[in-house]
């Protein structure tokens, strides 16, 4: 065991709601951490790129490819 296991256990046991909610008492913490991660991925820019711009670019590329595929398929069906 690591030397931190005792302090981690004390911290987890001191988190309120253990009797009523059990392990589900940590859900608000995970929601907040997830929201913070999402916020940072959208708003923080590394160099010239951030996650949001990259995602939108990939989404637009996939949409264009799908439309081209559908148009090619329609052209083949009419021949």
Swiss-Prot record:
Expressed in the brain. The gene is sloth1. Disruption phenotype: Adult lethal, mainly due to flies becoming stuck in the food medium post eclosion. Rare escaper adult flies have slow motor activity, reduced climbing ability and short scutellar bristles. Larval motor neurons and adult photoreceptors have a reduced ability to maintain a synaptic response upon repeated stimulation. Enhanced photoreceptor degeneration due to accumulation of ninaE/Rhodopsin-1. Impaired mitochondrial function in larvae. Required for the assembly and stability of the mitochondrial ubiquinol-cytochrome c reductase complex (complex III (CIII) or cytochrome b-c1 complex), a multisubunit transmembrane complex that is part of the mitochondrial electron transport chain (ETC) which drives oxidative phosphorylation. Keywords: Membrane, Mitochondrion, Mitochondrion inner membrane, Transmembrane, Transmembrane helix. It holds the Pfam family UPF0640. This is Ubiquinol-cytochrome c reductase complex assembly factor 5. Coiled coil: none annotated. It is a single-pass membrane protein. GO terms for biological process: mitochondrial respiratory chain complex III assembly. Residues 1-20 are mitochondrial matrix. Expressed from one of two small open reading frames (smORFs) encoded by a bicistronic transcript. The ORF for sloth1 has a non-canonical Kozak sequence while the ORF for sloth2 has a classical optimal Kozak sequence. Both ORFs are expressed because ribosomes occasionally fail to initiate translation of sloth1 and continue scanning to initiate translation of sloth2, a process known as 'leaky scanning'. The chain crosses the membrane at residues 21-43. It comes from the Eukaryota. It comes from Drosophila melanogaster (Fruit fly). One of its GO terms (molecular function) is protein-containing complex binding.
């Amino acid at each position: 065991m690591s030397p931190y296991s005792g302090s981690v256990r004390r911290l987890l046991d001191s988190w309120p709601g253990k009797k009523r909610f059990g392990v589900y008492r940590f859900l608000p913490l995970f929601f907040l951490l997830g929201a913070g991660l999402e916020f940072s991925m959208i708003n923080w820019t590394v160099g010239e790129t951030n996650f949001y711009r990259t995602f939108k670019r990939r989404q637009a590329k996939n949409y264009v490819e799908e439309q081209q595929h559908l148009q090619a398929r329609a052209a083949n069906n009419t021949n």
